[in-house]
Amino acid sequence: MNVRVRGIYTTALTELLGGEYDIVQASPPIQRRFEASFPVAVADATVRTSDDRLGAGIAGTADAVDAVGETLSALGRDTFRWTDPAPRGAVFYGEVTETLGSGAVVDLGTVDGDSVEGFLPYNRVEGYVDEGDSYRVQVASPEPPWGDARPSLATALRIPGGLVELRRGSEGGLSETARMADLLPVDPPEGWTPNWSRAADDASLEAMEAALRRASDRAETVMEAVVDADRDEPGRIVAPQAGAWLLFGRESRFELDEYRRQIETTMPGHHRTKAATTAASAAVDFAEALCEPDGAFPFDVVTRQFGPTEGDDVTISHGKPDGRTISLGRGEVTDRDPEAESITVEREMSGGGTYDAIGVKREAGDIATTTFVEGRWWYPTVYCSADGERRGTYVNICTPLEVFPDTVRYVDLHVDVVKGPDGDVRRVDDDELDAAVEAGEISEPLAERAREVAAAIKKAL
């Protein structure tokens, strides 16, 4: 099985996947690092770092996506995987539900019980777009479930591929590779034109033939499905390739460091630091080029250089095991402790309702004080009134915390521990954790870790 890898995790993933799969279309830097020549062949699956650098997307044949996804899911306890209901190239019948400044929100129906929406830019559709309009659309750029963006859509059909992309009704290229392709014993379906990638410049005629044949088969599958589609409700018509998303947690990023370290000098927290901010990428490369880093993750240096520090505002990004991410609000960093590798964040609360599981009324002006320790599996939030009276403590059990420059990230593991104003300590939401395991959203090893942490916290409180 052939796998293509791109993005900041490429070196580590090439080392990890190379023992089980054939790596193809490797970039020049990867070939230099591995001191190897990788074939330019058709990829059964492509693994690409997500735009926010928090994880990776997989696209390709259903079998390949499933196999590679299984391999990467085993990377660490805090790696999460979800099937993409709207992978690149998928065709939907959609209905416009809202018009925005640069495009329209499109209802794409449901896939496997999950509602799907997309975003259709106005420059990708002819004529005026209004609510209630219906279009046949294709996913041009998929988006991970933990982000805020919707999959980007287009009305023109294309068949994605690593070496060649088929475009409906466009003109052919004039490159040397395009001229070489005229010698191939296979032609694209009528009305489709091949657009060859730069990687194809180094491909053999056999590889080009295989790529064009696969793309042509996908094009025929798409057109047959489009012709046969008879629907007036939003929904997916066809998906010529499968997709999946993986969210890496802190433990998984450090495990990826170990794979990269087998090939290249790698500082502790290499991937964790690069995932936090693009500004750190050059600094990490510079540090690794100067010396052989060792020891622990340099929390003090990283947070001092890139943030957060006292006075900064950070968002609490509360990830859910089903893939969503919810913001618990922003707060001010009131303390940064380099030795404890922690920050303390304060938020002023609005009035109304009660504190979850604590049961105490929430008043306007209450202060929530939260301490986040890098790498810890839990964090406490102490709620106090404006005059300092303690209302309760809520301890969230989660995947290892990552303190990024403008946000604290983790995935919530449902079970929590609370302490009321009277000192009563309770463990809550075990049933939600059990349900998440039953649904396949949380692995049993991860759930067991969450239960162990919750038990220890309850005993300590």
From Swiss-Prot:
Residue ranges annotated for the S1 motif domain, each copy included: 89-158
Residue spans crossing the bilayer: none
InterPro entries xref list: DUF402, FomD-like_sf, Ntdp-like, RNA-bd_FAU-1, S1_domain
GO biological process: rRNA processing
Pfam family, one: DUF402
A molecular function (GO) term: RNA endonuclease activity, producing 5'-phosphomonoesters
Top-level EC class as recorded in UniProt: hydrolase
Keywords, sorted A to Z: Endonuclease, Hydrolase, Nuclease, RNA-binding, rRNA processing
Disulphide connectivity of cysteines: none
EC number(s) stated in the UniProt entry for this protein: 3.1.26.-
Keyword RNA-binding: yes
Record-stated family: Belongs to the FAU-1 family.
Protein's job: Probable RNase involved in rRNA stability through maturation and/or degradation of precursor rRNAs. Binds to RNA in loop regions with AU-rich sequences.
This protein's name: Probable ribonuclease FAU-1
Species of origin: Natronomonas pharaonis (strain ATCC 35678 / DSM 2160 / CIP 103997 / JCM 8858 / NBRC 14720 / NCIMB 2260 / Gabara) (Halobacterium pharaonis)
Origin organism lineage: Archaea, Methanobacteriati, Methanobacteriota, Stenosarchaea group, Halobacteria
Encoding gene per record: fau-1
